[in-house]
Regions:
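Nucleotide-activated chemistry modules centered on ATP-dependent adenylation/adenylyltransferase
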Residues: 2-12, 17-439
């Protein structure tokens, strides 16, 4: 017999086998269930998912378009900060979780839900990211995590148990040839993990990669673009007409110009996919303490990071950039990966980020070719930290080269003291004395 009256649950619903069974199981447990789907740019048959959820027994179904919010409030701040985890991962999955969680909490308030449920596994990062966000935005919310509930995971020990339950509940299951890995997609990236990828020495099959062309399929001629940034945010994309290498470099007004923030990002996605840009295969350290292997395709994000970092070299003060790199970039990347986006520390770090980006105004010319993002030039008409005449070997300006003698003398005082000390210890200038000793 079905229990009744336990309360209202908002379920993060994907339309797949797991969350469809969770939806039916929650109803069996006596909950009224509202199903929620976020459109963050993934390829999905949302209409079919809605019909399926309502047929299973969901009281209501919400589909919320969060693409613009995702780009403007998560992706572009990450671009400003040059966010990266462990030197390689551009945080595509992590970036989507705060915006999905916020959308869910909005519906929780509208529908007066006492509970929220998700289908995250008990070994992954996403359970942490979602639940931290839920509690930060709605401290009194109660979370149901079936894959951490013994009653659920003991009953559904494998896919066969889920399929049997789906048949019992008349849940339609779209049968396809099962791919031996799992995926998670949004407009920033797609991730592949689990299954055959759990062996870190297994080469991913060519047909796994969904978004980005293999290098053998990419054009053999470069495509030239210019990205214009305002305070570190991309505000214009110019796609230049095909030209020979003998013509003058293109200007920002030479070609098709796109200024809508969403369209800029989506167009860069298409260009990067076409030219084989943005694939990685890594082993990373999860927040919960285990290592995992992940393969990622991050097309537009790869181009934007290269362009943004290059422009910063032209327009950002040396010490400001060093502080941003050592503090803001590393801390915001950890905040994103570990699920602390909605926190006091993120607000503080982001306020520092915004200050660091005040001078990041200008344009970067790029060439896209065979998996490479090649910088061909950069320009800013408002920021004047770079002075070509000042650094020229062929001109004398206000830079007094004789002053360098004093600079070297002062900076080398401590080096001379260090050198005197090592000579006093009997050390020499031989290689075995001056270089690091190997154990």
């Amino acid at each position: 017999m079905v229990a009744t009256g336990k309360g209202r649950v908002l379920l993060a619903y994907s339309g797949g086998l797991d969350t469809s069974c969770i939806l039916a199981w929650l109803i069996d447990q006596g909950y009224e269930v509202v199903a929620f789907m976020a459109d963050v740019g993934q390829e999905e048959d949302f209409e079919a998912a809605e019909k399926k959820a309502l047929a299973i027994g969901a009281a209501k179904f919400y589909l919320v378009d969060l693409k613009k919010e995702f780009i403007e409030n998560l992706i572009y701040p990450a671009v400003q900060a040059n966010c990266i985890y462990e030197g390689v991962y551009l945080l595509g999955t992590s970036l989507a979780r705060p915006v999905i969680a916020r959308g869910m909490m909005d519906v929780v308030v509208q529908e007066d839900c006492q509970f929220v449920a998700h289908g995250c596994t008990g070994k992954g990062n996403d359970q942490v990211r979602f639940e931290f966000a839920f509690y930060a935005l709605q401290p009194k919310i109660k979370v149901i995590a079936p894959w951490r509930d013994p009653e659920f995971y003991n009953r559904f020990a494998g896919r066969g148990d889920l399929l049997a339950y789906a048949a019992e509940k008349n849940i339609p299951v779209f049968q396809t040839a099962a791919k031996p890995w799992s995926t998670d997609e949004n407009l920033f990236h797609i991730s592949y993990e689990a299954g055959i990828l759990e062996d870190p020495n297994t080469c991913p099959p060519d047909d796994m990669w969904k978004l980005i062309k293999g290098l053998s399929e990419t054009p053999k001629e470069p495509e030239r673009i210019t990205i214009t940034f305002t305070k570190g945010i991309p505000t214009m994309l110019t796609i230049h007409p095909a030209q020979t290498q003998h013509t003058p470099p293109p200007t920002t007004s030479d070609g098709q110009c796109i200024t809508d923030p969403v369209e800029i990002f989506l167009t860069l996605n298409k260009l990067a996919r076409k030219h084989g840009i943005g694939r990685i295969d890594i082993v990373e350290n999860r927040f919960i303490g285990v290592k995992s292997r992940g393969c990622y395709e991050t097309p537009a994000g790869t181009i934007l990071r290269k362009a943004h970092m290059d422009l910063e070299g032209l327009v950002v003060d040396r010490n400001v950039r060093a502080l941003r790199d050592s503090f803001v970039t590393t801390e915001l990347s950890k905040i994103l990966y570990n699920g602390f986006w909605f926190s006091a520390e993120r607000e503080f770090v982001q306020s520092c980020l915004e200050k660091s980006q005040e001078t990041v105004n200008g344009s970067v010319r790029l060439s896209l070719l065979c998996g490479n993002v090649i910088v061909e030039g950069r320009y800013s008409d408002s920021e004047k930290l770079y002075n070509a005449e000042e650094v020229s070997m062929d001109s004398v300006t206000d830079f007094d080269v004789s002053a360098t003698t004093g600079f070297i003398a002062i900076e080398s005082i401590r080096l001379k003291k260090w050198g005197e000390a090592r000579l006093a210890r009997g050390e020499t200038v031989k290689p075995e004395s001056v270089y690091a000793k190997r154990q």
